[in-house]
Amino acid sequence: MPTIQQLIRNARQPIENRKKSPALRGCPQRRGVCARVY
């Protein structure tokens, strides 16, 4: 358990859940999810 002074110096950041494919965020057509067929 951290001391009060440590908590004041750097407050705890909430752990953010990681996205499964961060590299494909800008390119949805490479993700393998097909929303529409042309």
UniProtKB/Swiss-Prot annotation:
Region (Disordered): 1-26
Stretch forming the signal peptide: none
One term under GO cellular component: chloroplast
Keywords in alphabetical order: Chloroplast, Plastid, Ribonucleoprotein, Ribosomal protein, RNA-binding, rRNA-binding
Subunit structure: Part of the 30S ribosomal subunit.
Function of the protein: With S4 and S5 plays an important role in translational accuracy. Located at the interface of the 30S and 50S subunits.
The protein's name in its UniProt record: Small ribosomal subunit protein uS12c
Organism of this sequence: Pinus contorta (Shore pine)
Gene name of this polypeptide: rps12
